[in-house]
Amino acid sequence: MRAICVLSGGLDSAVTSLAAKFENYDITTVTFNYGQMALNQEIKSAKKISEILNADHHVIDINFVKEFSKSGLNTGEIPEPEKEDLDDFEKSEKTMKAVWVPARNMIMFSIASGFAEGIGAEKIFSGLNKEEGVTFPDNTPEFIERFNKSLEYGTLNKVKMVAPLYELNKPEIAKLGKELEVKLDLEVLKYSYSCYRDNGEDYLHCGTCESCMRRKRAFKEAGIVDPTKYLVE
C-alpha cells in the first residue's frame, strides 16, 4: 500500500505521518513552498522526520501563492494572542484571518492528489484536525468529504484523502503522537516544527505565535514532557 503524507513538519502532520507508518503504508512525504516565513525550518523538520520514517521526501514549489497572499505567514506580520484567547472564538477567528493563505489547502491537496495518482498511491494523509477546524473552514469534516467527492471526478484511481486526527484536539494529538512513537520505537515529535517564524536555529520556536501557544498547551494538557525549545517559555 502506498500513501502520500502532506508533511509541513508541524505537530499535526508529524503525528499523521506516524499514523500512516503505523498502518504499514509505504510513505512518500511532500512539503509545500508557498513563500512562508518558516519555510527553511519546515523543510529541515520534514526532511528529518521523513528520514526517520524511511520515506521519500519532496519539496513542491507553489511560491506563486505569495503573489496574491496577504497572510502573515507570507508577510511576517504574525499575531501574538494571549493564552486565554485560544478558546475565544471571536479572537481566534480574527487571528485565523490574519494568517489565512488563500485556498492554500485546496491547492496543496489537489497537487498531492495528482502526485498520489501518478505514483499509484491510494491515500493522501493530511493533518486536518478538530481544534483548527473550529476556525479554519478547510480543516472541517465537511471540507474532507467534499474534497473527496471532487476526487471521484478528478482522478482515475479514485485516490482518497484521509485525516486520522479530524476528531482530535491538540492535546489528544500530542498524546497519540507519543503513543505511536512508543509503538514504533521512533522519535519524531522533538523534530517537529510548529512555529510561524524562522528563529534562526533548528527546531527553535518563538513561543508567542498562536501555533506555538497551541503546541505548548497541547503537551502540557496531555501530561507529556514538551521536547520543544522556545525563545519565550
UniProtKB/Swiss-Prot annotation:
Listed pathway(s): Purine metabolism; 7-cyano-7-deazaguanine biosynthesis
Protein name: 7-cyano-7-deazaguanine synthase
Source species: Methanococcus maripaludis (strain C7 / ATCC BAA-1331)
Any Pfam family the entry gives: QueC
Thylakoid as UniProt keyword: no
Positions bound to ATP: 7-17
InterPro entries: QueC, Rossmann-like_a/b/a_fold
Transmembrane regions: none
